[in-house]
Amino acid sequence: MSVPDVAVVKAFLIDLQNRICAGLQALDGQATFAADSWTRAEGGGGTSRVLTQGAVFEQAGVNFSHVTGAAMPASATAHRPELAGRSFEAMGVSLVIHPNNPYIPTTHANVRFFIAQKEGADPVWWFGGGFDLTPYYPFEEDVREWHQTSKDICAPFGDEVYPKYKKWCDEYFFLPHRNETRGVGGLFFDDLNQDGFEQSFSFMQAVGNGFLTAYAPIVERRKETEFGERERQFQLYRRGRYVEFNLVYDRGTLFGLQTGGRTESILMSMPPLVRWQYAYTPEAGSPEADLYDNYLKPRDWV
């Protein structure tokens, strides 16, 4: 297995953050990202970049972090107990975008690299990441295009890659207590190292580079769609699912909190406004019911 080049991965991630922020600013056309660099007492640091109250995006956060530690946290060793006691480095770019317009989906993307080392032993490393889409008022053409782009990203790496990571995404972004998916999925991968460093890194780069290719056309198509208070209230209600998933199930959030990560950056994914409603049930045949009936369960889109 080829030797990991940590510096090359870090350089790519910093550049990716810059390029995604530039692309999102261009899509918004009004607001700009404020950068907030931070250091972590236990080792490492990062830069959080947040755009708020834009013409298109109510809030968009794009975070780069590179943290180091002397021992692995419980969230990372739960399914890899052999890694307990190793020092680690974790780096990645993570983003969440909450648009103003309920007809534009919320989206999340993340690419990351993890390496754990111990004197006298080979390093253990892997890549992870993916992206997923959470519409409020979905359009089938948007969802199909999103998944076609996902499939195109995976194609050079083998025909089995897209179905595998699409299925993993559907399974990961699932709320058992609601019995529904968080959205319409995309790609999710983790523990990627079996093809060696170069090939694994290439796939992670393809996913990171492909995110805006998948998302930008949907934003452009829907950003002028008119909406009213009904759509806004439903958007705020459905954002509650995002909060529930991230605080209860998301491994990245739990890892960050357990490793003493920067709380503001970890919770950057939270929507700026959200609401809950007791025992909400959409009206039969309504656009809101369409989301529940046709989109919040795994489907083959391409």
Swiss-Prot record:
Superkingdom, natural source: Bacteria
Predominant location of this chain?
cytoplasm
Q: Which reaction does it catalyse?
A: coproporphyrinogen III + O2 + 2 H(+) = protoporphyrinogen IX + 2 CO2 + 2 H2O
* Active-site feature positions: H108
Tell me the compartments it is located in: Cytoplasm
GO CC annotation, single: cytoplasm
* Annotated GO biological process: protoporphyrinogen IX biosynthetic process
Marked site, Important for dimerization, at: H177
Q: Which InterPro entries match?
A: Coprogen_oxidase_aer (IPR001260), Coprogen_oxidase_aer_sf (IPR036406), Coprogen_oxidase_CS (IPR018375)
EC number in record:
1.3.3.3
Q: Note down the stretches annotated as region Important for dimerization.
A: 242-277
Needs which cofactor? Answer: a divalent metal cation
Pathway recorded for this protein: Porphyrin-containing compound metabolism; protoporphyrin-IX biosynthesis; protoporphyrinogen-IX from coproporphyrinogen-III (O2 route): step 1/1
Task: List the GO molecular function terms.
Answer: coproporphyrinogen oxidase activity; metal ion binding; protein homodimerization activity
Residues noted as binding a divalent metal cation in the record, renumbered to the chain:
H98, H108, H147, H177
Chain residues that bind substrate:
S94, N110, V111, R112, G260, G261, R262
Keywords carried by this UniProt record: Cytoplasm, Heme biosynthesis, Metal-binding, Oxidoreductase, Porphyrin biosynthesis
Q: Which function does this protein serve?
A: Involved in the heme biosynthesis. Catalyzes the aerobic oxidative decarboxylation of propionate groups of rings A and B of coproporphyrinogen-III to yield the vinyl groups in protoporphyrinogen-IX.
PANTHER family this protein is in? Answer: COPROPORPHYRINOGEN III OXIDASE, MITOCHONDRIAL, OXYGEN-DEPENDENT COPROPORPHYRINOGEN-III OXIDASE, MITOCHONDRIAL
* Oligomeric form and interacting partners: Homodimer.
Family per record? Belongs to the aerobic coproporphyrinogen-III oxidase family.
**Record's protein name:** Oxygen-dependent coproporphyrinogen-III oxidase
**Biological source species:** Shewanella sp. (strain W3-18-1)
